[in-house]
Swiss-Prot record:
GO CC annotations on file: eukaryotic 43S preinitiation complex; eukaryotic 48S preinitiation complex; eukaryotic translation initiation factor 3 complex
The entry's keywords: Acetylation, Cytoplasm, Initiation factor, Phosphoprotein, Protein biosynthesis, RNA-binding
Name of the gene encoding the protein in the UniProt record: EIF3D
Lineage: Eukaryota, Metazoa, Chordata, Craniata, Vertebrata
Coiled-coil features, chain-numbered ranges: none
Annotated positions of the Phosphoserine modification: S161, S528, S529
One protein family per Pfam: eIF-3_zeta
Domain writeup: The RNA gate region regulates mRNA cap recognition to prevent promiscuous mRNA-binding before assembly of eif3d into the full eukaryotic translation initiation factor 3 (eIF-3) complex.
Role, per record: mRNA cap-binding component of the eukaryotic translation initiation factor 3 (eIF-3) complex, a complex required for several steps in the initiation of protein synthesis of a specialized repertoire of mRNAs. The eIF-3 complex associates with the 40S ribosome and facilitates the recruitment of eIF-1, eIF-1A, eIF-2:GTP:methionyl-tRNAi and eIF-5 to form the 43S pre-initiation complex (43S PIC). The eIF-3 complex stimulates mRNA recruitment to the 43S PIC and scanning of the mRNA for AUG recognition.
Compartments it resides in: Cytoplasm
The protein, known as: Eukaryotic translation initiation factor 3 subunit D
Post-translational modification N6-acetyllysine, affected residues: K53
Acidic residues bias spans: 529-548
Length: 548
């Protein structure tokens, strides 16, 4: 029969736990430890070490006892010996050799320090992966600007061209990578509907200007008309009988080359029945050419500084207007189109009007889009055989060659003009693309570029002409990598999106800090003044009277 053995119970009235140590455990050495402690690590003599702070205490014990089992690399002093310290003359080869030896010694010392402080050791394959990871990280930082140079200025957030209100609703959003993939080939040959205005002939003496024979830029007081689409009387007349999309060449060029833009801009779209009108806002900076917009470090001066972005744009506008008239044979014979300038009143002096001609052209984009555009010519030129060529005249201006990785035009323009135009293509890519699109839309045979610089870098009121250059628009488009098929594809995409909208007023806005354009729906009365409303009411009353 099984017998129950009563266990021995130890009573400890003054504490808890056993009163005495059992005989089998008496005098046995013991040190607190944790089962999670690592007893040591395998020494890898072929691997490379690198510091990883996450594993600094990987092999250390929580109780302080496991460290006696860890591996520490100690220097071997068995090979220590005295050497002769007498200084001898060293050759250049020996000096370089000692330099490399000292570098290797420092590397070995760093490796020993890493081993001592429990730093991770990588095998050769992991070493290559780590190098690849660091290389890709540096490439990413360089590409996206995460890591800035010590002397690089931080980019300030740019302001929007118009304040977005809370009651505006986003209807569509298009990012630039998506637009850059657009292509459209079904574009018909343009058809001239109406030609207006008069042009002066280009003075070929300006082609012989060099940096040694610079010519002062004169201030010429002439009137330039920048009339938007819906205020154009010719477009209003044409809209009654033909076309369903109407715009100006400047507005279309902005859309067609929008993927190069950096600053914010906006275009008003009005959907009236089945027709679309692309307009610009009144009193906006839409017609001001930007300066160094696409440079790595665009101008960021603020306030009244003459190098602020807006003041530079005003200076560029002044230069463009004056150069486009000074390089013509003013006051002499003009080339007249069949119809007069639609924006000139009868009592105005013809010599006070800038040399400009308007060509209203029509394109068929597929079967459903009938596009009518007002295009411009700035002058006319005669060839060797007396043939007439229409030209667009634009100006590149140098404001400070020390900024935006520029080159000094007075030193490089005659001998290295390619370097100058390459720098301008980098710093003003969007502006040059817009000018090229305008010349292509107008059908101009040549695009004339004038090089104008400040008389002194600190004086933004006086300028000198350093030279001129002309391009054929198609060849120049290829030179600046402007795809005409992509430009028409972007325009067709924007038109299709706007055609799907309901009747009303909308705004196409380029985000000031992102590569995105958005389409906003605008409430009634937005961007409309009281005078515009009164004019619309008067026009409606006149139409009603004519009908009765």
């Amino acid at each position: 029969m099984a017998k129950f053995m009563t266990p021995v119970i130890q009573d400890n009235p003054s504490g808890w736990g056993p009163c005495a140590v059992p005989e089998q455990f008496r005098d046995m050495p013991y040190q607190p430890f944790s089962k999670g402690d690592r007893l040591g690590k395998v020494a890898d003599w072929t691997g490379a070490t690198y510091q990883d702070k996450r594993y600094t205490n990987k092999y250390s014990s929580q109780f302080g006892g496991g460290s006696q089992y860890a591996y520490f690399h100690e220097e071997d002093e068995s090979s220590f010996q005295l050497v002769d310290t007498a200084r001898t003359q060293k050759t250049a080869y020996q000096r370089n050799r000692m330099r490399f030896a000292q570098r290797n010694l420092r590397r070995d010392k760093d490796r020993r320090n890493m081993l001592q402080f429990n730093l991770q050791i990588l095998p050769k394959s992991a070493k290559q992966k780590e190098r690849e990871r660091i290389r890709l990280q540096k490439k990413f930082q360089k590409q996206f600007g995460v890591r800035q140079k010590w002397d690089q200025k931080s980019q300030k957030p740019r302001d929007s061209s118009v304040e977005v209100r809370s009651d505006w609703e986003v209807k569509e959003e298009m990012d630039f990578p998506q637009l850059m993939k657009m292509r459209y080939l079904e574009v018909s040959e343009p058809q001239d509907i109406e030609c207006c205005g008069a042009l002066e002939y280009y003075d070929k003496a300006f082609d012989r200007i060099t940096t040694r024979s610079e010519k002062p830029l004169r201030s010429i007081k002439r009137i330039f008309h920048t009339v938007t689409t819906t205020d154009d009387p010719v477009i209003r007349k044409l809209a009654k009988t033909q076309g369903n999309v109407f715009a100006t060449d400047a507005i279309l060029a902005t859309l067609m080359s929008c993927t190069r833009s950096v600053y914010s801009w906006d275009i008003v779209v009005q959907r009236v029945g089945s027709k679309l009108f692309f307009d610009k806002r009144d009193n906006s900076d839409f017609d001001l050419p930007t300066v160094s917009e696409t440079a790595n470090e665009p101008p960021q001066d603020e306030g009244n500084s003459f190098n602020s972005p807006r003041n530079l744009a005003m200076e560029a506008t002044y230069i463009n207007h004056n150069f486009s008239q000074q390089c013509l044979r003013m006051g002499k014979e003009r080339y007249n189109f069949p119809n007069p300038n639609p924006f000139v009143e009868d009592d105005m002096d013809k010599n006070e009007i800038a040399s400009v001609a308007y060509r209203y052209r029509r394109w068929k984009l597929g079967d459903d889009i009938d596009l009518i555009v007002r295009c411009e010519h700035d002058g006319v030129m005669t060839g060797a055989n007396g043939e007439v060529s229409f030209i667009n005249i634009k100006t590149l201006n140098e404001w400070d060659s020390r900024h935006c990785n520029g080159v000094d035009w007075r030193q490089k323009l005659d001998s290295q003009r390619g370097a100058v135009i390459a720098t301008e293509l980098k710093n003003n890519s969007y502006k040059l693309a817009r000018w090229t699109c305008c010349a292509l839309l107008a059908g101009s045979e040549y695009l004339k570029l004038g090089y104008v610089s400040r008389y002194h870098v600190k004086d933004s009121s006086r300028h000198v002409i350093l030279g001129t250059q002309q391009f054929k628009p198609n060849e120049f488009a290829s030179q600046i990598n402007l795809s005409v098929e992509n430009a028409w594809g972007i325009l067709r995409c924007v038109i299709d999106i706007c055609m799907k909208l309901e009747e009303g007023k909308y705004l196409i806005l380029k985000d000031p800090n992102k590569q995105v354009i958005r389409v906003y729906s605008l409430p009634d009365g937005t961007f409309s003044s009281d005078e515009d409303e009164e004019e619309e009411e008067e026009e409606e009353e006149e139409e009603e009277e004519e009908e009765t």
